[in-house]
Structure formats: C-alpha cells, structure tokens
C-alpha cells in the first residue's frame, strides 16, 4: 500500500463457540486450548496471546479505523452524538416489515430504527417489547423505545447497546418462550468453568421450559429472580450475567404473563407464529 511497513496477516477461523466472543477465551482458543475465559488482570494488553501484549477488537471497530485515519477524528465524531461518535451497525430481526442490517449514526432512536428504517410491524399488530442490543441485553417496553441507541442513553434506561442486534416482538410473541429460548442458548454455550453459571443457567432454562410447557409452579418467578441474584457478579466472565440480565428484565416487566402460564397450565399464545416480513 506504499506505507513502507510490512506485516504478516493470518485469518484463523474459529469453531463458532459463543464463549470465544470473550477476549481471553478467544486467546485461549487461538493458542490451541479449550475456549475458557481467564481471570483478569493481567489484561490482554499486558499479557495476551502466547504471553505477549495483545490488542483484541471486533471487526466492526477495526473497519472504522481507516476512515478515522483518512478523514480525522472530528469528522468521525460528528457522525454520532456528543459522547458516542461515529456510526453503528444495527441488525434488526423479529416481527418487522424489513428485517436487515442498517448502518446509522450513533444516537439514532430505537423508535426510528424499528418504525422508520425497518418499516414497523405487520398490519394490525401492537408492539410488545424490543431487545435493543442482542440476546444479553434487557428488554425495553414500548414506552421506553424513544431512547437514543448509544451506550450512555441505554444504560440510563437499564439496558445496553451490546452488539446492536435489535429483536422486535409484537403482541403474538410469548415472553416466557423468549426467556426460555435465551436461557437454553446460554446453558448450551456456557464453558462450565464457574459454578453459578454452570449450574444456575441450566436450572434457569429448566424452570422456564416447564413454565412454557404448562408445568410451572406459583413460586417459579421468584425462583428465577433468586437464581439471577446468585449468578450476577459471581462469575469470571459475563456469560452467566448475559443470561441473568435479560431473564430478570422479562420476569419483572411481564410478570403477569409468567403467572398466567402457571394459572392456565399452558402457553396462552399457542404455537410459534410463522415469520412475517415484506420481501
């Protein structure tokens, strides 16, 4: 490229384990070990791959670097909001007309992403909730989605930007089923290193599955909250919390739906509805 600087680049494919999204588990995997997070410190910038200082960044972050170098930091910051500059990739899925990947300025409101860029809901449907930043981020109610999609604003409403993966749910969606699917995913992806995550997340998944199938107990919502309390803050990496935080929010915000499953002994929403979107 005419820079006078040369380097060797290797593209090393992974096996798809979710836990390897954690930086030190990724390093362990690249070293040929099982993908399990390390205790920190030391942080990768001090002691990372094969003991050397290592920078670990997402591809999305690295893709911004050439534009910042070519056009300057001020230009990049001008694209977003005051404390969160640049653009962000928002992947919108769920019950919307136009699911897809949208690159938008940081600070674009969640309402605009769902109803303007992704086209809103199917005719006659009502919004029930939106997960703003991927499966690990707490759900937001319809009255909360006027929030700007940036790190600080979402933190103020009790959620996170995360990966920017927006999941939209309308009034056909069973929130107990949502919680059960999330918990089953995290139970499968746990590396098993930490007891609260290894034991607590599958237990949570089992409780949610029996609620979904009509075998729930009256104290299951409280038991789920207790499990969340015991998982959060007690693991080496955030994977256990990534399950506990969204489940806690779903139980808190849709408590009556969980109780209805217990009371009626079945899922009142019936089978999973087919996907709907405009092609």
Q: Model-found features: residue ranges?
A:
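Terminal amphipathic helices with adjacent charged low-complexity linkers/tails
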Residues: 7-9, 122-156, 252
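Short, surface-exposed loop/turn segments at secondary-structure boundaries that line and modulate
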Residues: 16-19, 132, 136-141, 229-238
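Hydrophobic alpha-helical positions that pack around
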Residues: 1-106, 118
């Amino acid at each position: 490229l005419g820079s006078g600087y040369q380097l060797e680049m290797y593209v090393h494919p992974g096996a798809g384990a979710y836990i390897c999204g954690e930086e030190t588990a990724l390093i362990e995997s690249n070293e040929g070990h099982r993908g399990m997070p390390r205790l920190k410190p030391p942080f990768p910038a001090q002691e990372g791959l094969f003991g050397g200082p290592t920078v670990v960044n997402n591809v999305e972050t690295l893709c911004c670097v050439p534009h910042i170098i070519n056009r300057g930091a001020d230009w990049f910051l001008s694209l977003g909001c005051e404390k969160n500059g640049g653009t962000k990739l928002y992947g919108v899925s769920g019950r919307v007309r136009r699911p897809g990947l949208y690159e938008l300025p940081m600070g674009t409101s969640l309402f605009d992403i769902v109803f303007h860029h992704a086209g809103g809901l199917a005719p006659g449907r009502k919004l029930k909730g939106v997960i703003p930043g991927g499966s690990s981020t707490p759900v937001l109610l319809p009255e909360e989605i006027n929030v700007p999609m940036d790190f600080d604003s979402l933190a103020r409403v009790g959620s996170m930007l995360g990966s920017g993966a927006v999941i939209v749910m309308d009034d056909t969606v069973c929130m107990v089923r949502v919680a059960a699917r999330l918990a089953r995913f995290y139970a499968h992806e746990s590396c098993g290193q930490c007891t609260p995550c290894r034991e607590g997340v599958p237990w949570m998944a089992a409780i949610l599955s029996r609620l979904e199938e009509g075998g729930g107990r009256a104290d299951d919502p409280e038991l789920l909250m207790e499990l969340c309390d015991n998982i959060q803050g007690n693991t080496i990496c955030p994977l256990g919390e990534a399950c506990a935080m969204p489940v806690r929010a779903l139980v808190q915000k849709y408590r009556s739906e969980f109780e209805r499953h217990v009371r009626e002994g079945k899922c009142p929403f019936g089978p999973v509805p087919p996907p709907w979107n405009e092609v």
